[in-house]
């Protein structure tokens, strides 16, 4: 009985609570960073240096009454819960250094669940019965499906490097050097694709304020809106943690496993800061530019690199490092 409680209740809670706390403070960091980049202060009233601002925002949103438009679909309108559930489930196979769910095909698990997140966006846009929400949802589906093709091919290339589908093997592969150095074109395309996958600027066409009011979540208020918000930021942290594992090596130490967690989270935090920097620096892409980037640039490049990495091992009679 104790094992069941630890495995199925305590372990998931132990990783969910820090993720939700990190999400809360990522929103604060984003507002502060954007503030200083625009030569203003950002939140600095609630608590010392504005540190209690995310708590105040959370309390304010969750005590508001969740309003549902009379013309909306009541069953599909609860999809923000699915968005957050998927965002938190994705953290299960992350090697920090020991995963909550030790899966043999953890990369495929992450790819499959990140694809499912589109359904929560599409369903909420459809359920709102608003043309702005529907257009935002359709944009999200089109761009996510487009970029997942290149994401899958980039993952295939790094799997060829490491010789395994488990995320722990990447620590072994990168003991000598980070994969971001020999495979820097892959790392650059992966990072840009994760920006798009999380609907961040300059690819935030799903919630283009100047065109679609607020995008797919325009009819949501209070708690359900906060759940979408939490899911978006949990996905940002997850994608950056995954980028750190795949390309920046999580430097596993058998004597000090907590050192692995510390270095991994530091790398993920730095990559998240670059997300904020990009948001402050670049204007939004036009929709046709977004599609041209993936279908005319990323797809041919990633296909060429997959063929190149496959042919290299055959030509040099080499095998993945630990095979």
UniProtKB/Swiss-Prot annotation:
PROSITE patterns in UniProt: COMPLEX1_ND1_1 (PS00667), COMPLEX1_ND1_2 (PS00668)
GO biological process, one term: aerobic respiration
Location in the cell: Mitochondrion inner membrane
Cross-referenced InterPro entries: NADH_UbQ_OxRdtase_su1/FPO, NADH_UbQ_OxRdtase_su1_CS
Recorded GO MF terms: NADH dehydrogenase (ubiquinone) activity
Keywords: Electron transport, Membrane, Mitochondrion, Mitochondrion inner membrane, NAD, Respiratory chain, Translocase, Transmembrane, Transmembrane helix, Transport, Ubiquinone
Pfam assignment, any one: NADHdh
Listed EC numbers: 7.1.1.2
Transmembrane domains' residue ranges: 9-29, 76-96, 107-127, 145-165, 175-195, 227-247, 258-278, 298-318
Entry's Gene Ontology cellular component terms: mitochondrial inner membrane
Catalyses which reaction(s): a ubiquinone + NADH + 5 H(+)(in) = a ubiquinol + NAD(+) + 4 H(+)(out)
Membrane topology: Multi-pass membrane protein
EC category name: translocase
Its job: Core subunit of the mitochondrial membrane respiratory chain NADH dehydrogenase (Complex I) that is believed to belong to the minimal assembly required for catalysis. Complex I functions in the transfer of electrons from NADH to the respiratory chain. The immediate electron acceptor for the enzyme is believed to be ubiquinone.
Similarity annotation: Belongs to the complex I subunit 1 family.
Name this protein carries in UniProt: NADH-ubiquinone oxidoreductase chain 1
Gene source species: Gadus morhua
Lineage: Eukaryota, Metazoa, Chordata, Craniata, Vertebrata
């Amino acid at each position: 009985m104790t094992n069941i409680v630890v495995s199925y209740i305590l372990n998931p809670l132990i990783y969910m609570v820090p993720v939700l706390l990190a999400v809360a403070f990522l929103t604060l960091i984003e507002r502060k960073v954007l503030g200083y980049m625009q030569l203003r202060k950002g939140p600095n009233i609630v608590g010392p240096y504005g540190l209690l601002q995310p708590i105040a925002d959370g309390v304010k949103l969750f005590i508001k009454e969740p309003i549902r438009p009379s013309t909306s679909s009541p069953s599909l309108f609860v999809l923000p819960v699915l968005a957050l559930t998927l965002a938190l489930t994705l953290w299960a196979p992350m090697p920090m250094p020991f995963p909550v769910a030790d899966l043999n095909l953890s990369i495929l698990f992450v790819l499959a669940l990140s694809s499912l997140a589109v359904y929560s966006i599409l369903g909420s846009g459809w359920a709102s019965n608003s043309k702005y929400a529907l257009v935002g949802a359709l944009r999200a589906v089109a761009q996510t499906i487009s970029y997942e093709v290149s994401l899958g091919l980039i993952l295939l290339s790094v799997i060829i490097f490491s010789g395994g589908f488990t995320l722990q093997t990447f620590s072994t592969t990168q003991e000598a050097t980070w994969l971001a150095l020999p495979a820097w074109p892959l790392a650059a395309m992966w990072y840009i694709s994760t920006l798009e996958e999380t609907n961040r600027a300059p690819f935030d066409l799903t919630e283009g304020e100047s065109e679609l009011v607020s995008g797919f979540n325009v009819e949501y208020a209070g708690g359900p809106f906060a759940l979408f918000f939490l899911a978006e930021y949990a996905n940002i942290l997850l994608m950056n943690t995954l980028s750190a594992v795949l390309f920046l090596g999580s430097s596993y130490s058998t004597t000090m496993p907590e050192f692995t967690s510390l270095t991994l989270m530091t790398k993920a935090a730095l990559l998240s800061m670059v997300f904020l920097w990009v948001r402050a620096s670049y204007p939004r892409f036009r929709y046709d530019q977004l599609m041209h980037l993936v279908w005319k640039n990323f797809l041919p490049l990633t296909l060429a690199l997959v063929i190149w990495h496959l042919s290299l091992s055959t030509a040099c009679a080499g095998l993945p490092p630990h095979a």
